């Protein structure tokens, strides 16, 4: 966690992730020898990535090997996109719309407004 005080400086609230960033600016309020930019240690339960950045998997996920389809290209050809965070996929949305239209035509009602995305 981090806190941002009214001075605008970012301060780590947990010692494990504390990092003091040095400044080469001559008009800095802190001497650069005091704030040298300590390295954040590698968490003990997390495997290291080949890139050297253990945190990269949190932002970028697993990288595909060169020359292999990445899933997005194959999904783009079929027109389907899978969303992993629980949102409705394009295919499911189409099925719901078709079902809604068929149910409303069976009951003699006009189809309602489209489902919100």
Curated annotation (Swiss-Prot):
Residues 22-46 are annotated as: Disordered. Expressed exclusively in the exocrine cells during pancreas development. Disruption phenotype: Impaired exocrine cell differentiation and growth. Loss or significant reduction of exocrine cells are due to lineage-specific cell cycle arrest but not apoptosis. The endocrine cell mass appear normal. Cell cycle arrest is mediated by up-regulation of cell cycle inhibitor genes cdkn1a, cdkn1b, and cyclin gccng1. The keyword Repeat does not apply. The keyword Nuclease does not apply. GO terms for biological process: cell fate specification; cell population proliferation; exocrine pancreas development. Induction: Expression is directly regulated by pancreas-specific transcription factor ptf1a. Probably also regulated by retinoic acid (RA). InterPro entries: PPDPF. Signal peptide: none annotated. Pfam families: PPDFL. It comes from the Eukaryota. Residues 23-33 have a biased composition (Low complexity). Keywords: Developmental protein, Differentiation. Belongs to the PPDPF family. Probable regulator of exocrine pancreas development. This is Pancreatic progenitor cell differentiation and proliferation factor A. It comes from Danio rerio (Zebrafish). The lineage of its organism: Eukaryota, Metazoa, Chordata, Craniata, Vertebrata. The gene is ppdpfa.
